[in-house]
């Protein structure tokens, strides 16, 4: 299936170079389109031309690219338009070894297949405590019963620790059971002035320390912590104290948008509004997948099928921009006039 996806990308990108009818095509583009169009026309009985000039010819070429995109991703879109019928035989065209594919397309598909079949350490974009169910007021003393050291979450990437005079304790537990981190990068600071439960202000005296694995860490400097070594706080002074510990970022095996080059841009290209026809077409295609049909996914896609849907669909969007096809989509009423931000915004409601 990798070669089929690579051929689909190659042919669609070749079609996206047809910016004008009199353009001088590169030799490899002529070879790719010549073989692909000949095979496609022979199997589907369509009349795609290499240099589309009329609206009907542009539509035929776009429908060929749409067939290839759907075949490469294994999507059966069904009856979405009175002007278009999906040709299942297109998979046979893409399986033809005579159709060349570019090194770039092959490398991109290989990267997707390789990255989605394994896991690796990645810097996570969300706060370490993002999914916590409760939070505490920053800078306000809080001590649980029968404790001398209490750590609480006070933000999506922040905890604060309240310490009694002379108290020492391990705050590692508050990090446990969250996000399965491989490495956490911390910065700790003294909370110079904080409010006691009664509302009076109190100062944290110098001398409070935070240590990792028994080694004192300097305040205000990034600390690399594996989540396993003891994370101790110590207040050797004769007054209550508070410290703040911020998770600058952390690394885990969760997939991110960095797993594939320009994945963020590809997602934006897919979900961008071009006109109501494209908006309806994209929605109809994504309705047959696990991806959201209108707005980008909340979390990065982490499976091969999803990424190999987004990549060809993004290329199809480029082809749509270049060929400017005009056809009907069931349930879509195109709005005449120039595209404005208000029109695009209204389409997502």
From Swiss-Prot:
Membrane spanning residue stretches: none
Family annotation (Gene3D superfamilies): 2.60.120.170, Bluetongue Virus 10, subunit 1, domain 1 (1.10.250.10), Bluetongue Virus 10, subunit 1, domain 3 (1.10.170.10)
UniProt keyword terms in alphabetical order: Capsid protein, Glycoprotein, Outer capsid protein, Virion
Glycosylation sites: 287
Any single Gene Ontology cellular-component annotation: viral envelope
GO biological process, one term: fusion of virus membrane with host plasma membrane
Recorded superkingdom: Viruses
Location(s), subcellular: Virion
Pfam families reported for this sequence: Orbi_VP7 (PF00897)
GO molecular function: host cell surface receptor binding; structural molecule activity
Job of this protein: The VP7 protein is one of the five proteins (with VP1, VP3, VP4, and VP6) which form the inner capsid of the virus.
Recorded family membership: Belongs to the orbivirus VP7 family.
Self-association state and partner proteins as the record states: Homotrimer that assemble in a complex of 260 capsomers on an inner scaffold composed of VP3.
Protein name as annotated: Core protein VP7
